[in-house]
Amino acid sequence: MYSFVSEETGTLIVNSVLLFLAFVVFLLVTLAILTALRLCAYCCNIVNVSLVKPTVYVYSRVKNLNSSEGVPDLLV
């Protein structure tokens, strides 16, 4: 049977291809993790804007109104 390349060259080519594929898989996994973290940060921002900030605003507004009118802190 005829061989176009030597065994050492064939092994080097196969190892290079496998190393390249491992690098591509590593990049895909890294990209997936970064995308998941970005989605998590986006969802946390939605929760912050829609729930936390209005609550803090209402709390501070009521506290300021109570302190300016001399009413005891019954509403807070």
From Swiss-Prot:
One of the protein's GO biological processes: viral budding from Golgi membrane
Transmembrane intervals: 17-37
Coiled-coil region(s): none
Keyword Membrane: yes
Short motif (PDZ-binding): ranges: 73-76
Residues on Virion surface side: 1-16
Membrane association type: Single-pass type III membrane protein
Location within or outside the cell: Host endoplasmic reticulum-Golgi intermediate compartment; Host Golgi apparatus membrane
PROSITE patterns from the UniProt entry: COV_E (PS51926)
Record-linked CDD domains: SARS-CoV-2_E
Consequence recorded when altering V24M: In strain: Isolate GD01
Family indicated by similarity: Belongs to the betacoronaviruses E protein family.
Function of the molecule: Plays a central role in virus morphogenesis and assembly. Acts as a viroporin and self-assembles in host membranes forming pentameric protein-lipid pores that allow ion transport. Also plays a role in the induction of apoptosis. Activates the host NLRP3 inflammasome, leading to IL-1beta overproduction.
Subunit-level organization: Homopentamer. Interacts with membrane protein M in the budding compartment of the host cell, which is located between endoplasmic reticulum and the Golgi complex. Interacts with Nucleoprotein. Interacts with the accessory proteins 3a and 7a. Interacts (via C-terminus) with human PALS1 (via PDZ domain); this inhibits the interaction between human PALS1 and human CRB3, and causes delayed tight junction formation and defective cell polarity.
Record protein name field: Envelope small membrane protein
Species, as recorded: Severe acute respiratory syndrome coronavirus (SARS-CoV)
